[in-house]
Design a protein with these regions (language model features):
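Short, contiguous alpha-helical
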Residues: 2-13, 25-39, 44-86, 124-172
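Short, low-complexity N-terminal intrinsically disordered segments enriched in polar/charged residues
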Residues: 14-22
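Soluble or luminal CAZymes and related metallo-dependent hydrolases
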Residues: 20, 27-31, 99, 103
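Acidic catalytic patch
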Residues: 111-126
Length: 172
């Protein structure tokens, strides 16, 4: 969608949803469960130090995924869309997993409170005016993208194949 053609506060014409809010939450949490397993597949030192081709370490990517999802969840629930502030990256794997788990619980409790009509309302997202559903889909897409990077990192470390702890990408 061309953000110049959409104004904040506009609601798109009602069309039947492809996913219900409950299905969206289940889909999103399925991705999050798989990404959590991938975070755990890294050793502590590799999580925050190892990267390929100038990309960021997976610990930094994990924090970005957590921060983006937390920001979008807060926006969806509160219906306020300020410029994001990401906060400090957790310094250890256990801290990242704890923040991840706290956010998972928040999503389970708070996402069902978002009125379904809000998803079709155009909101002033920090990358341009878009329907609110685009924000949720962005968080999911961003996670899939970064999780793919994590798989590349683990494979380049030789952590792939039968008997290793790398979860298959289809097990969400």
């Amino acid at each position: 969608m061309d953000s110049e053609q959409i104004s904040a506060g506009v609601t798109l014409a009602h069309t039947p949803p492809i996913l219900t809010p409950t299905q969206l939450l289940a889909h999103w949490q399925g991705h999050r469960r798989l990404t959590r397993r991938l975070i755990k597949a890294f050793s502590e030192d590799q999580l925050y130090s190892y990267a390929v081709g100038g990309m960021r370490p997976f610990g930094a990517l994990g924090w970005e995924m957590c921060a983006v999802t937390g920001y979008i969840l807060t926006c969806l629930v509160s219906d306020t869309w300020p410029h994001p502030t990401w906060g400090e990256q957790p310094p250890h794997q256990t801290a990242l997993l704890s923040a991840w788990d706290d956010l998972t619980a928040r999503m389970d409790a708070e996402l069902p409170t978002v009125p379904p009509a809000r998803y079709s309302e155009v909101k002033p997202l920090f990358w341009g005016a878009q329907p609110a559903i685009n924000a949720a889909l962005y968080a999911i897409d961003n996670e899939i993208h970064h999780r793919g990077q994590g798989y590349v990192y683990l494979r380049s470390l030789g952590q792939s194949g039968p008997g290793l702890e790398v979860p298959p990408f289809w097990e969400r």
